[in-house]
Amino acid sequence: MTNATDIGANDVEMEVDPTAETLADEKKNQDVAAVQEIREQIRQIEKGVASKESRFILRVLRNLPNTRRKLNGVVFRNLAQSIYPAGADREAAVALMPAVEKDATELPDVPKKQVATKAPIAEVDAYFYLLLLVKLIDASDLKRAGISADALMAKISIQNRRTLDLIGAKSYFYFSRVAELKNSLEGIRSFLHARLRTATLRNDFEGQAVLINCLLRNYLHYALYDQADKLVKKSVYPESASNNEWARFLYYLGRIKAAKLEYSDAHKHLVQALRKSPQHAAIGFRQTVQKLIIVVELLLGNIPERVVFRQAGLRQSLGAYFQLTQAVRLGNLKRFGDVVSQYGPKFQLDHTFTLIIRLRHNVIKTAIRSIGLSYSRISPQDIAKRLMLDSAEDAEFIVSKAIRDGVIEATLDPAQNFMRSKESTDIYSTREPQLAFHERISFCLNLHNQSVKAMRYPPKSYGKDLESAEERREREQQDLELAKEMAEDDEDGF
């Protein structure tokens, strides 16, 4: 019995050890595959530099989200041997690398044939530091990330190579991100302006787009809306920028317009930003834009549809805004105050608190409109009681302002001390239906124009090189005649 028990225990031990070894082997194989993948990306970058084709570099950068998940200290140490020759450059790179995990398995040494003997080209050097910066940000190692970002900017700033523009544009974004995490955005503003001037002079369109977005985010972080508006007016955003950069720019533009009380323009820009953003990714960005759209729609006097709050991935994050919408729709000042006090910190994090405070006037207008529809005559004291105002004089002032603004059609009778509502008129006898149709038609026309611009047509000179059907028939006829003549000449030769 004892022997059988010992044998069973040994079997259990034998089952545990292979599992641990298998996990270690899988981890090692993943690291080897990651190193090989990044080396292939480096070859693509070198190919793009040699052929002066940016599409190879663009293909590598598009794969950055997948690459960043595979990075670790072991991968970086193996790559450094094949990129940098032994010396100061390799030591500087190794000093910034993240620490190797305790359970990590070291990869075999790089073969002598693959060990670097000369310094890498500027594009490969910048790409390695970009990967290093991304990993340090993910690891929340802000001290090393700051040093790595400064080193990367120094490498990019001293170069004047068009093949470095795409990597530089991506680097500016993460450089600004590190400064934001370290709460030092103000310190990099002059550097970003200098790089924007350089990118504009060199026609670096992707760099221009990223730098303008970084500067707008910088200004909005400190609520400098006037400076952000001046930057938008004095700079030209490149049409060839990627969809992601356009989505960011339109979102920042919507925030600026909303802060400056231009709600119609703000709503238009925010809707465009939502359409240009990825439909099945970037959930955080879509949530942020949708929150601002809801607040702007409420400021415009519109009530968002209930289906907006039921979208997958947005339902939980929009819960506070659903309650806010309910309070505005009902014109309930008490409920509006409760929502603002309960979710105030959340609204401040979403950068919508200032706009939501402005909604108080909309809530009052909605309440007065509902009172005007419900009562033909009502005293200011009753209005103050319903709106929970301090005095009847406040209610009288608010009602007179609502009448002046056209919110309600009513008259105030100070002698008898009541508000008399006028009979409701037929809305189809006014210009409102015409204006609504005009807005819809304008939207359809703008959508059509944007769709046409998005299509790619061959240049006009392309058709000049193409022959018509008659020219083709004439050419074929000439070829046949020439072939007959050659055949006759051959026969004559015999």
Curated annotation (Swiss-Prot):
One of its GO terms (biological process) is ubiquitin-dependent protein catabolic process. It comes from the Eukaryota. Coiled coil: none annotated. GO terms for cellular component: cytosol; nucleoplasm; proteasome complex; proteasome regulatory particle; proteasome regulatory particle, lid subcomplex. Keywords: Proteasome. InterPro entries: 26S_Psome_reg_C, CSN3, PCI_dom, WH_DNA-bd_sf. One of its GO terms (molecular function) is enzyme regulator activity. Residues 458-494 are annotated as: Disordered. Residues 247-426 form the PCI domain. It holds the Pfam family PCI. Residues 462-486 have a biased composition (Basic and acidic residues). Blood (crystal) cells and cuticle. Belongs to the proteasome subunit S3 family. PANTHER family: 26S PROTEASOME NON-ATPASE REGULATORY SUBUNIT 3, 26S PROTEASOME NON-ATPASE REGULATORY SUBUNIT 3/COP9 SIGNALOSOME COMPLEX SUBUNIT 3. The 26S proteasome is composed of a core protease, known as the 20S proteasome, capped at one or both ends by the 19S regulatory complex (RC). The RC is composed of at least 18 different subunits in two subcomplexes, the base and the lid, which form the portions proximal and distal to the 20S proteolytic core, respectively. Acts as a regulatory subunit of the 26 proteasome which is involved in the ATP-dependent degradation of ubiquitinated proteins. This is Probable 26S proteasome non-ATPase regulatory subunit 3. The lineage of its organism: Eukaryota, Metazoa, Ecdysozoa, Arthropoda, Hexapoda.
